[in-house]
Amino acid sequence: MKNAVKNYFKNIFAECSKVELVWWWLLRGLMVFGIIDTIVNGKDYDGSNPVIQMFANLLGMFAYEICQLFPKKNRMRLLSPRFQNITALGFFLGSFCGAYLNFYYIVPGFDKILHALGTAEAVYIGYEYVAATQLKFKKTCPHQIATLCSLGLGFVFSSAWEVFEFTYDQFFGGDAQHWSYANALKTAGGDPSKIFNLFLVSDPMRFALMDTMGDIVLNFVGGFIMYAILCIIPYRHKGKGDVNAKILREHAEERKSEYEAATV
């Protein structure tokens, strides 16, 4: 058991740079501070419970470490730690800035910005997942196909997030979708013209619908921007991180071993 724990941390430190570890723990530390401060001082918040949201997203900040608990050949175990540089920031912006600092209601368009960034992040994670899948099955793949797959996965992830928000609001009394016109109007000082929305809302009854449609439009925009970036810079399919080259080397080593075994 002791050796297993030792090897677990050894694998993590071997794959991650010191800069990455500092980055992760800086964001995690701020999240812990926000949770403790909210519990001790009982901050008011217009939306869902910030403690629950921050604690759940704090766990999400350990995604890479959790992935390392999977069996060695599992594709989750094969994910690069690079993905957590982005996901940790996403969780931080959504929970610490959004829930703890209440940016969702006091910063115009904050939720919309996060939706664009979130789907861009989802496409990025999808790209890493495709690369991990290649490593698992030892199959090469042109970067054009890999990036197209990542786009599809990104939209699946963003749709899953919308389902999560709906479920949380519908069955647990939350405001994850920020559908509450009353909260938005209160934050705007009672002036409907000061409520930020991507589309004009002439009827308060359409506020929630227009908010969700704005989210979907920006999901689309953010996802395609990241897709374009990955098409231009397919970093997992060129240079030192080229998974295709790694797979071809492994195939060559296997053939060499088979040849040597056959000639003995």
Identify the function of each model-found stretch.
Residues 2-213, 220-264:
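Bulky hydrophobic segments
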